[in-house]
């Protein structure tokens, strides 16, 4: 009897292991059947281990090895990688509303599923439509003075660091500027975060912004997607609960205070959303509810912080390694804004070389190194069958450095984006902010923010290499596109007279 029971136990165990193995590999034959090449997936984990060498270099390696299209697996989830610009246009633009509306879900996010970057289908369309007027050029012009005051704080803080006579860690300085601008424009909160690191807002926001593709919760959901509804039922979220509660309470309090005080308020994103709630032109059932206002404020913070701080850091490294470009940029700024005049929205638009420098930096270092869309139904795109549930991924970083599309792609050449040349650039090869109806809603705000800071910096400082500067710059292996080591440069005052200090 014991022997029989023992045998049954072993058979049951063996059957369980076989079923478990089949579950862990059931999707892994998809691309092989379709004749699409790619690295060999491992049970359960797929091709995730390949990311250990760095996601961005891995994408470039795959482009060289497999050609225009290849297949990957994040756990059991198939990713079809496409690089053909016509196919990318179909996914991002032509079939956006019908098939490729949504981004990938990264698991339980609580009320943040209402945020414009995360929401899906009709919910996304409604929120996007309501938010779009917030990012018009007219609204950005009104918001520019808010950002300008933080540009003065940036100059003051950088001057104080430079006067210590030591090389400056740029991410710390630009991270503080970025946080000040985003908290000021999305929450209406004034903070000099570099000088007030213990401020509750600063501490909570910094916790929110810590992110890694190798986070245990994210990995568990990638390997076992069926855990998502269980985590949601247990109120476990990708975002720290205490941080989200703090931000939710803060926004609600700020909103209540503003509604009680009838005085004219400055134009910021929070106020514009409050105004839209009370607009007679919007049906009450379509307007943003209070929790949606909170979600949008937080997602603006989450998306805007890294874009600004990292891009400014990359720009300064490139300018320090290309002093001729830095000098030419300073000359353009000095000509259009003599005597350190403050930039206006219209002046920023006129600065052609400034635009070229920023665009070329975003080519080399696009903050979103990949774009993804989920296929909602079986579809044939340009002769390629894409099954329902497949994630279609466009490797932006690899496309931006593809020698088939760029001469000497690893070289920093702002002239690529001159008036004469930029019309030759395919918008479905170069897309640092995405493309189509679901591109980055805050693109113009981000560019204005970056350019305004860059003008203030170039008016007052020159940036030079020092022994601590990593040359050539290497990228880290975490999820976001960031340098391997902090970017450290020598900062020199141009004339000792620093406006705003």
UniProtKB/Swiss-Prot annotation:
Q: Which Gene3D superfamilies match?
A: Cytochrome P450
Keywords of the record, alphabetical order, are: Endoplasmic reticulum, Heme, Iron, Membrane, Metal-binding, Microsome, Monooxygenase, Oxidoreductase
Its BP terms in the Gene Ontology are: oxidative demethylation; steroid metabolic process
What is its membrane topology? Peripheral membrane protein
Its main subcellular localisation, reduced to a broad class, is endoplasmic reticulum
What InterPro entries does the record tag this protein with? Cyt_P450 (IPR001128), Cyt_P450_CS (IPR017972), Cyt_P450_E_CYP3A (IPR008072), Cyt_P450_E_grp-II (IPR002402), Cyt_P450_sf (IPR036396), Cytochrome_P450_3A (IPR050705)
User: Where is heme bound in this sequence?
Assistant: 440
Reported cofactor(s)? heme
Cellular component GO terms held in the UniProt record:
endoplasmic reticulum membrane
Give compartment(s): Endoplasmic reticulum membrane; Microsome membrane
The protein's Enzyme Commission number? 1.14.14.1
Q: What induces it?
A: By rifampicin.
Q: Which GO terms describe its molecular function?
A: heme binding; iron ion binding; monooxygenase activity; oxidoreductase activity, acting on paired donors, with incorporation or reduction of molecular oxygen, reduced flavin or flavoprotein as one donor, and incorporation of one atom of oxygen; testosterone 6-beta-hydroxylase activity
Task: Report the family membership.
Answer: Belongs to the cytochrome P450 family.
Q: What does this gene product do? A: Exhibits progesterone 6 beta-hydroxylase activity.
Q: What is this protein called?
A: Cytochrome P450 3A6
Provide the taxonomic classification. Eukaryota, Metazoa, Chordata, Craniata, Vertebrata
- Which gene codes for it? CYP3A6
């Amino acid at each position: 009897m014991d022997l029989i029971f023992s045998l049954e136990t072993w058979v049951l165990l063996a059957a369980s292991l076989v079923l478990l193995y089949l579950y862990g590999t059931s999707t892994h034959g998809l691309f092989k059947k379709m004749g699409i090449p790619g690295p060999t997936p491992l049970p359960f984990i797929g091709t995730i281990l390949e990311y250990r060498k760095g996601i961005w270099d891995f994408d470039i390696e795959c482009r060289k090895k497999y050609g225009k299209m290849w297949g990957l697996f994040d756990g059991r989830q198939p990713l079809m990688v496409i690089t053909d610009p016509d196919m990318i246009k179909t996914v991002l633009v032509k079939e956006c509303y019908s098939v490729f509306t949504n981004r990938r879900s990264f698991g339980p996010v609580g009320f943040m599923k209402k945020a414009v970057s995360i929401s899906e289908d009709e919910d996304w369309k409604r929120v996007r439509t309501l938010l779009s007027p917030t990012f018009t050029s007219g609204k950005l012009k009104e918001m520019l003075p808010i950002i300008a005051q933080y540009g003065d704080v940036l100059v003051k803080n950088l001057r104080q660091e430079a006067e210590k006579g030591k090389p400056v860690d740029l991410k710390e300085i630009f991270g503080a500027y970025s946080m000040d601008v985003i908290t000021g424009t999305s929450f209406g909160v004034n903070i000099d975060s570099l000088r007030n690191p213990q401020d509750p807002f600063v501490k909570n926001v910094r916790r929110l912004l810590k992110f890694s593709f190798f986070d245990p919760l994210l990995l568990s959901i990638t390997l076992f997607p069926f855990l998502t509804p269980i985590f949601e039922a247990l109120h476990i979220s990708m975002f720290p609960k205490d941080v989200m509660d703090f931000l939710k309470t803060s926004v609600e309090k700020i909103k209540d205070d503003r509604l009680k005080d009838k005085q004219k308020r400055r134009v910021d994103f929070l106020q514009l959303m409050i105004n839209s709630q009370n607009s007679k032109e919007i049906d009450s059932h379509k307007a943003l509810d209070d929790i949606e206002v909170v979600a949008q404020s937080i997602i603006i913070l989450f998306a805007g912080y890294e874009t600004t701080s990292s891009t400014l850091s990359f720009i300064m490294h490139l300018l320090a390694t290309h002093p001729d470009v830095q000098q030419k940029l300073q000359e353009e700024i000095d000509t259009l804004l003599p005597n350190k005049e403050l930039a206006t929205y219209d002046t920023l638009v006129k600065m052609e070389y400034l635009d070229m420098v920023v665009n070329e930096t975003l080519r080399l270092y696009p903050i979103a190194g990949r774009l993804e869309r989920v296929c909602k139904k079986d579809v044939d795109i340009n002769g390629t069958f894409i099954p329902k549930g497949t994630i279609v991924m466009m490797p932006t970083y690899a496309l931006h450095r593809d020698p088939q599309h760029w001469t000497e792609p690893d070289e920093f050449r702002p002239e690529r984006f001159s008036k004469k040349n930029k019309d030759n650039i395919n918008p479905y090869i170069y897309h640092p902010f995405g493309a189509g109806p679901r591109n980055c809603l805050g693109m113009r705000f981000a560019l204005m923010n970056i350019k305004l800071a860059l003008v203030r910096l170039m008016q007052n400082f020159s940036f030079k290499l020092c022994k601590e500067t990593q040359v050539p710059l290497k990228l880290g292996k975490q999820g976001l596109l960031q340098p391997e080591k902090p970017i450290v440069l020598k900062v020199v005052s141009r004339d000792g007279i620093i406006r705003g200090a």
